[in-house]
Amino acid sequence: MRRIALPVFAVLSMSLLLPQQLAGAAPAGVSLAGVAAVDDPPLAEGDFLQVGPGLYSTDEQSFEIYETDVADGLMSRSHSVTAQAGSVAKPESAPASRPDMGVFGPGWEAEFVGGQLNRKLEEKANSVVVTDLDSNVAITYTLQSSVDYPSGGGVKKYVTADGDKLTETTRFDEATGTLVATASEVVGVTAPTADEDQSADTDATAAIGTSELTPAYTWKQAAPGADSWRVTGVGNVAVGSLSTATYDTQGRISTIQEAAVGENPAQSLAVKYSTATTSTSAALGEFAGRVKEITLTTGATTQTLARYSYDTSGLLRSVANPVEGTEPVSSYAYDSTGRVSDVTSPSNGDWDLSFPAESAVPNVEPIGPARPSSESVFTGAADITNEAAVAPPATDFTTGEISDPQSYPRHCNRATDWMWYLESGCAAWAAHYGWHKPYWKQTPTGHWVVGINNDGCSTPGPNVSKPRGFNFRSACDMHDYGYGLIGNTYKGYKYYLDRNKKSNVDNAFYTTMKTYSCNAYFITRRPACKAIAYVYYKAVGWKGNPRNGANAT
């Protein structure tokens, strides 16, 4: 959701600086007391409401649909509709100077790597300004020191009022005979406060792994034109978990590389673009300059995981996953203003939308069965609502492990069917360092997800569920539930999420932090929140394994 640019030193009202609590009472099984008391960041004004397939901000008067086409690498995009003074609400499009964000056509903004690449760097006289293009927040880094090299170039160091650091290095390149500038940006999480309850944490007596919780960005002048700086790496330097990006000559994303870390092999995502328009009035097809497909290479295996189709006006109309079949997994229709009026989405469901008068909040009608309501009684596996039960009944186990590539029940084939309880019957015990029942959990925006009661956010040393005060506890409890559902396959428990859904569980974890947690905080605090959310996401990607929790059950 891009807004009018705000500087990080914007003056806050005293009401925003007072302690604030999550709206609504916590249901049975929900505990927020396990998180240590820290100075919470100021909350956003207004409310965030789940409206059909998207999220509506009452303060910003903006509605956003967030879609992820490829879970690996968080290859995502967003469609935002914002109210206009004295006119109809209009969809937002990518800035003209950012071809990398406009590759899905009008009304959509690319959010590759979960939107972490959508940042802008501008050099001023004695400062550097980095703008988060999602929230349109400008972060000012003030010059602290500089050193010149005898051969040309040098090093300049900058810092923000919050202690975030940026270093720009310029060196003479003998091969090209030019000065080449790069930059590194570090978002500080100095002295994070550990959770009060560490009873389920096996390394609670060790030092807090601050360096492993610290987000970092690398930058390079990789695009043509005045707006030339691009993020070329994002993640955590201490554990070598940077996602690296390359760009083509037009400044569009070319590849996203993931280095081999832990048990995970190296991966490479390639974004391919159409060179000609093939769509006609009779059939959808390619559109010149738009994304054609996204492929994933792991080892010697390359798969096309997303293929896009457009109409003759260049509007995105459908997305297919060739690995699953030729039929679209997502499809869209638009009204005369370019706003999505019909959506079919694996994660957001099937909906009809209409925008009344000048409002940005749509009227929505579900297509097909309605979703279960939040805080409703779970249906699914036996004894999940039995307070006296401590494990699944013996009759629900088979002999040996389950390697079936499809989840059971069969209609619960998406990670979010369980973790957000989108389908009735998609609830079960979870094998994650013991048997756990599912409970409703509330995120800082008031959104309801499903998780277990265990150890919160697993981090090096004592667990930290509120880094820099941002509350990720519900997202972490939900992620533990997702891993436990996959872990059920190792225990022979007949209710499970299939093993190839790990990246989907991790993707839902990131979305729950980025969209349903970070948006709760005042707009100037969101860039830091999202950066830390990405580090938490990267950590479970390279370190997390559902088998571990199952083996300990």
Model-inferred region functions:
Residues 145-165:
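A short, surface-exposed interaction/processing loop segment used at functional sites
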Residues 70-74, 132-138, 161-167, 191-192, ...:
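Glycine-centered tight beta-turn/hairpin loop motif at sheet-sheet or coil-to-beta transitions
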Residues 387, 392-553:
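Extended terminal accessory/targeting regions
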Residues 67, 75-81, 123, 141-147, ...:
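Aromatic-rich beta-strand edge motifs centered on tyrosine
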Residues 130, 182-184, 189, 234, ...:
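Beta-strand-dense domains in secreted/periplasmic systems and polymorphic toxin scaffolds
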Residues 286-290, 297, 322:
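Extracellular beta-strand-rich, repetitive "passenger/adhesive" scaffolds
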Residues 26-151, 362-365, 370-397:
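Short secondary-structure "cap/edge" segments that initiate or terminate local elements
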Residues 1-29:
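Secretory targeting and sorting signals
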